[in-house]
């Protein structure tokens, strides 16, 4: 009987979607309890249950199509009573399809959270947390304002200069030396103003831009600013410096806070390390004169994930995604900067 077939289809759909909801709840629990990135991967295999991560929505779609068909019949014979009844039935069918359709939002949310947890644990990132370099806990606004005041590169916005996203971590080089690090996103906003016909300045639009960088604490080098941009730095990096290498001078602009200190520091070996560090990247590398803090600021998105979640319809595909994705620009910067600081 057709009615029995419909009942069976509804039952099968309910069972399939119930399994998906159970898997979603289990994924949330895994994400909250895992201590390491490997814990997440181990919890996903073996799964020992149906691995589906896609809602069954064929029946609601068919119901919506049938409802639309019944509604369109009204244009054939508007006065017919049966056509009018089919119009009401069509609206009811579309409404029922709407309330029974399962959106993918719960799946997308848990996958996004698993991505965040995997990134945090894989790279030891403590998001929105103060670096351990600051022994006394400070309000986020205070310690970020303190860091921005130390370097003359965080005043590029005429309206705002913010760190909407940051994370504290620790880098270890191949000799076992550890560096306290804060990775951040720098967002600044400029306004574009023109004069109207009365000669008054009016704001036309706002321009939003982003840069990304790191602070490295307790570094030995100090009082030097290096940039790949054609610009100058202001106080305290007031003294320009030209090396004996013409190609380096064409590629890098170097400034310092003390000429004698620069003469001691900028030996050929140090200049070569600078050249190697900037071989594949653009940006500013600044060593504060007094605070033993390094700041690198560039255009590469350090929080960029190599592959986003696409067409993940089961637990196996999810595990493969979480196992292989990475932060390529952050890995590259960590490798080159720890090598530079050795």
Protein language model features and the residues they cover:
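Cytosolic juxtamembrane N-terminal segments of multi-pass membrane proteins
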Residues: 2-55
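Transmembrane alpha-helical segments and their cytosolic interface motifs
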Residues: 50-71
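Transmembrane alpha-helices and immediately adjacent membrane-cytoplasm interface residues
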Residues: 87-112
């Amino acid at each position: 009987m057709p009615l029995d077939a419909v009942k069976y289809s509804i039952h099968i759909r309910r069972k399939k979607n119930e399994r998906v909801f159970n898997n979603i709840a289990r994924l949330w629990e895994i994400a909250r309890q895992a201590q390491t990135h490997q814990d997440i991967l181990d919890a996903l295999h073996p799964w020992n249950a149906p691995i589906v991560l896609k809602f069954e929505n064929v029946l609601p779609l068919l119901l919506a199509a049938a409802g639309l068909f019944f509604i369109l019949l009204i244009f054939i014979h508007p006065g017919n009573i049966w056509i009018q009844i089919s119009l009401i039935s069509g609206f009811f069918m579309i409404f029922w399809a709407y309330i029974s359709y399962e959106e993918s939002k719960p799946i997308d949310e848990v996958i996004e959270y698993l991505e965040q947890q995997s990134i945090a644990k894989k790279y030891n990132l403590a998001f929105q947390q103060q670096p351990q370099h600051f022994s006394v806990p400070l309000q986020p606004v205070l310690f970020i304002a303190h860091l921005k005041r130390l370097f003359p590169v965080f005043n590029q916005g005429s309206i705002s200069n913010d760190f909407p996203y940051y994370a504290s971590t620790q880098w270890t080089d191949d000799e076992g030396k550890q560096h306290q690090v804060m990775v951040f996103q720098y967002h600044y906003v400029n306004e574009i103003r023109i004069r109207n016909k009365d000669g008054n300045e009016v704001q036309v639009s706002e321009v939003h831009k982003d840069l990304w960088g790191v602070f490295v604490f307790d570094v030995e080098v100090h009082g030097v600013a290096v940039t790949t941009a054609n610009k100058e730095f202001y106080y305290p990096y007031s003294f320009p410096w030209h090396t004996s290498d013409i190609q380096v001078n064409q590629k890098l602009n170097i400034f310092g806070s003390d000429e004698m200190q620069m003469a001691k520091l900028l030996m050929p070996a140090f200049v070569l390390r600078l050249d190697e560090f900037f071989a594949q990247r653009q940006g500013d590398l600044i060593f504060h004169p007094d605070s033993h803090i390094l700041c690198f600021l560039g255009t590469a998105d350090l929080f960029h994930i190599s592959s986003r979640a696409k067409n993940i319809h089961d637990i196996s595909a999810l595990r493969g995604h979480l196992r292989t994705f990475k932060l390529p620009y952050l890995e590259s910067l960590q490798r080159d900067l720890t090598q530079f600081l050795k």
